[in-house]
Amino acid sequence: MRIALLLSACLLCLNAQAAPVDVASLDRGTWPEKLSSPALFDVASRAEILMFARSLLASESLDDAALKQRLGLRIINQAAIDDLRRQLWQRLLENYTVAQQSCEVDASFCYLVENMDDLREQAGKFEVSQDSFYIGWAAPSHTFHERHLDELLRKAALFPQISSEVARFGDHERNGDEFNDRLFLLTFDGGPAPVSGNTDWLADYLRKQKMNATFFALGSSLQTRVERSSAAQVEALYQGQCVGTQGWQYRSHSHWVDWQSSVTRSASLVQNLMPENYVPLFRPPYGQRRADSQGFFQSQGLQVALWDIDSQDDPGKLKAEESMQRVLTLMLLWRKGVIVFHDTQDKARVALPMLLQATAQSGLGWQDCREAFR
């Protein structure tokens, strides 16, 4: 075990990049229309899909050396990158096909796309003319999708030495790709925050909106909340919400000797404290977990809950409004999935109301946390 950990550490050192990949965010003010109807949501969705497809297609022309340089890596897993690209193309085709259903209402960004070859062809020649109503959006969107694609490709390039949300190890891992179109699940990581903090505010706000979310709690933080308040108050905190676990500590569970104890100890605490709120889901911190963990999770009756829309609301990254705009752009691109915020961060309590206001008339749905991943 110690030798394996040392080898993994050496691989990480060899693959260290010179500078972090820029976090993608897009000023939605560059888009000239509000998402005030399902049809207008589809217009914006088609535009983002085509722009991302353009970037994805262009990335395929990079040779091994150029791709390593772009991602800032010395070693890449080309097979994992190729597999991710195939998945992305399939998702883009599915999403564009659905988004075309409103073309009779508004034909903006509607092209004849009936199969993968058609989509690749349209992506290759996609551009926004200088006199277009949407020209102010084009360049910022292109930058956003280049950066977002780099985020995804870099994670695939490091897989499986560094596991993440972009690739699954088995059917016990879920990420919302089976949701219906326009259906999203809200999730929050890293909590609970201290008494009367952001977790309290977010849970109360969701109840007022008649919504729910899945909160992935850290065992140590949850135990501290109980000690500084009471079990009854913690149960009241999460009333109407779902609570999964993120382990006992917020640390990678891929090379931690005590990772199994971290999972079982925290899951038992949540289940004993809040049996009505508990959902048998484990959210790996940073998305990092072991490749051989399927048997363990199945023996515990747990599923691994991943995500596909990351708000990047961690400290030192995006501001609250930038985080919201990033999430909204990815909702337009992926059209369904699992959104992750951190309920220990002030940004979430700013970003969430803005997000709900921006999408209120878009025809979206919010997945009931009790029904997700059943």
Give the predicted meaning of each segment.
Residues 2-185, 197, 204-213, 335-374:
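Terminal accessory/targeting
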Residues 20-50, 291, 296-334:
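Active-site-adjacent pocket scaffolds in enzyme catalytic domains
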Residues 116, 121, 128, 132-136, ...:
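Metal-dependent polysaccharide deacetylase catalytic core of the NodB/CE4 family, i.e.
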Residues 159, 165-167, 173, 202, ...:
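Mixed-charge, polar/low-complexity N-terminal
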Residues 160-177, 195-197, 253-271, 324-327:
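Short, composition-biased local secondary-structure segments
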Residues 267-269, 329-330, 364, 372-374:
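Short, intrinsically disordered/low-complexity patches at protein termini
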